[in-house]
């Protein structure tokens, strides 16, 4: 089970938002590369970066900070990035800089042809991030709810050749209310590619619950607010996950 620390970037800083609200952000570090080093030193095997400004602007906005993170830890662990990735040139630039995976969210839903092209050009490097509320997919930094069912869309993207799906329950993100295990497992069971859980991880009980469903296709979990607030000790959580699932 991969426990994947999130580094959310806003104006070059590492922050956390409350339910995707750019006006409700808490700065946790003004040096994201040092934060990346911190998580790697505590046993992280992958990092999850989000360009928050980019997600809202539709183009990269924190590229300098991202490249500093890649220079610091990119040769040691896999790094994945989402937010503002809307064209193949951006993907190529980030992969050349040392990124392992690019996460396509809104653009995959709105422009499936772009996702197909990305999977063809950069097979093995494309992850789709699906954000959902009550089983329906949301786009544009969670501001718009679509009519798409998560499972149906994920199956289509699986056929395109995406590497995995990051599933975020946006009713829970940043609220420390527990991962929506049921919805995550339902999605994982419908697919043959891995699912990474996101949104609401709060304590060791969540780690235990996720490890219990790893065999259903749940590969890992994004760790956000809980590891920054101290509600969850990342190092201890990763050790527990390794003990449970080896």
UniProtKB/Swiss-Prot annotation:
Enzyme group, top EC level? isomerase
Pathway where this protein functions = Amino-acid biosynthesis; L-histidine biosynthesis; L-histidine from 5-phospho-alpha-D-ribose 1-diphosphate: step 4/9
Query: Could you provide one GO biological process annotation from this protein's UniProt record?
Result: L-histidine biosynthetic process
Q: Where is the active site?
A: 8 (proton acceptor), 131 (proton donor)
> HAMAP family annotated for this entry?
HisA (MF_01014)
Which NCBIfam families does this chain map to?
A: 1-(5-phosphoribosyl)-5-[(5-phosphoribosylamino)methylideneamino]imidazole-4-carboxamide isomerase (TIGR00007)
Q: Supply the name of the protein.
A: 1-(5-phosphoribosyl)-5-[(5-phosphoribosylamino)methylideneamino] imidazole-4-carboxamide isomerase
Which organism does this record belong to?
Polaromonas naphthalenivorans (strain CJ2)
Query: Coding gene?
Result: hisA
């Amino acid at each position: 089970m991969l426990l994947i620390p999130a580094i959310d970037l806003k104006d070059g800083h590492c922050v956390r938002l409350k339910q995707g609200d750019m006006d409700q952000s808490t700065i946790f570090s003004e040096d994201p590369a040092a934060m990346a080093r911190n998580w790697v030193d505590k046993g992280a095997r992958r990092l999850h970066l989000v360009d928050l400004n980019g997600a809202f602007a539709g183009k990269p906005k924190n590229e300098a900070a991202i490249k500093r993170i890649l220079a610091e830890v990119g040769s040691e662990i896999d790094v994945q990035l989402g937010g503002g990735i809307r064209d193949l040139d951006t993907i190529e630039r980030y992969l050349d800089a040392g990124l392992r995976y690019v996460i396509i969210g809104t653009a995959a839903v709105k422009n499936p042809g772009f996702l197909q092209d990305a999977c063809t050009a950069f097979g093995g490097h494309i992850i789709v991030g699906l954000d959902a509320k009550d089983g329906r997919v949301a786009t544009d930094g969670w501001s718009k709810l679509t009519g798409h069912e998560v499972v149906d869309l994920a199956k289509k993207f699986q056929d395109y050749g995406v590497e995995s799906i990051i599933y975020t329950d946006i009713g829970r993100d940043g609220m420390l209310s527990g991962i929506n295990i049921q919805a995550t497992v339902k999605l994982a069971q419908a697919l043959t590619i891995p699912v990474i859980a996101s949104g609401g991880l709060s304590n060791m009980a969540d780690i235990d619950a996720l490890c219990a469903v790893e065999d259903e296709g749940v590969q890992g979990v994004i760790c956000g607010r809980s590891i920054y607030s101290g509600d969850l000790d990342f190092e201890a959580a990763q050790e527990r996950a390794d003990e449970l699932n080896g």
